[in-house]
Amino acid sequence: MPVLHNRISNDALKAKMLVESEPRTTISFYKYFHIADPKATRDALYQLFTALNVFGRVYLAHEGINAQISVPASNVETFRAQLYAFDPALEGLRLNIALDDDGKSFWVLRMKVRDRIVADGIDDPHFDASNVGEYLQAAEVNAMLDDPDALFIDMRNHYEYEVGHFENALEIPADTFREQLPKAVEMMQAHKDKKIVMYCTGGIRCEKASAWMKHNGFNKVWHIEGGIIEYARKAREQGLPVRFIGKNFVFDERMGERISDEIIAHCHQCGAPCDSHTNCKNDGCHLLFIQCPVCAEKYKGCCSEICCEESALPPEEQRRRRAGRENGNKIFNKSRGRLNTTLGIPDPTE
């Protein structure tokens, strides 16, 4: 019976990945299609991916698959061929290749079955997720950006929007995708006559969001094919102006892909221009926040003097202080001025 899960420590796997000499390619993909038996599909894909030395994060549900992975460069074409052959629904699937990639995005393969591949909070039995808005490609995106009758809606979380977004795009302030969906409907009620263009990192969230908007009576809805990643790639290939400003936040060790030279965010500690996310080095905190190099040195990678002091304590004392605290890491939410519990590197399905 093959082993269908990882049995090596994270530290050992990360150390092994960091000394790998073979280049890797970071890839993301998704597909909404019916999977009759997600558990069996998960186990079969786990064996396929493991044989090709694929790392990353993969979610499966009855509604489809969502993956962010790292593949050895020498195995990319074999991976593509085997993925396409795995199920007719996956044949010809678009694979989003990372724009700014050092090959160190993942170091372990985690593959899970979930209720949804994106946690949307939708429980309306009449909702048709396949009734999506029209796709837009790079040139069409730029044309829409110049159309005064079009509104661009960013369907990413607040910390993603903070470091980069399309020109004049509207932020739907929320910590999770499930919070954004009803807010988007509410905020757009006065603009039902407008052309609504939705976008996200790789396309999975804005595709479902476009269907949700149509379900709620919005008729002129588009979404960007392949999200920010595919837009930027195609715009560059076609010699078009790239109209996304700043950095594209990604849900792996890189925490961002540089799209333009502009830095539109600021250090959460001193206010200097900066768009580099990090997690607080205090194991009892792990706050996700933006920190400039000066503050990183001053606070030793921590988010505050308190965390800096605590991280310098003996390990046993640190463990004692953490006992009984709320589990999970936090995200700095500048707009609300409070901390929010979530995963260390946020979960892209939330």
UniProtKB/Swiss-Prot annotation:
| Gene3D superfamilies from the UniProt entry | 3.30.70.100, Rhodanese-like domain
Active site, renumbered = 200 (cysteine persulfide intermediate)
One GO term in the molecular function aspect is: oxidoreductase activity, acting on paired donors, with incorporation or reduction of molecular oxygen
CDD domains listed in its UniProt record: RHOD_YceA (cd01518)
**Does the record carry Transmembrane as a key word?**
no
Q: Which domain of life is it from?
A: Bacteria
- Which keywords appear in this protein's UniProt record, sorted alphabetically? Oxidoreductase, tRNA processing
GO biological process entries: tRNA modification
Q: Name one Pfam family in it.
A: Rhodanese_C
Q: Which reaction does it catalyse?
A: uridine(34) in tRNA + AH2 + O2 = 5-hydroxyuridine(34) in tRNA + A + H2O
Q: Which residues form the Rhodanese domain?
A: 146-240
Fetch the InterPro entries from UniProt. Rhodanese-like_dom, Rhodanese-like_dom_sf, Rhodanese_C, TrhO, TRHO_N
Enzyme Commission number, as recorded: 1.14.-.-
Q: What does this protein do?
A: Catalyzes oxygen-dependent 5-hydroxyuridine (ho5U) modification at position 34 in tRNAs.
Q: Which PANTHER family match?
A: TRNA URIDINE(34) HYDROXYLASE, UPF0176 PROTEIN YCEA
Q: Which family does it belong to?
A: Belongs to the TrhO family.
Q: What's the protein here called?
A: tRNA uridine(34) hydroxylase
- Organism of origin is Shigella sonnei (strain Ss046)
Provide the gene name from the record. trhO
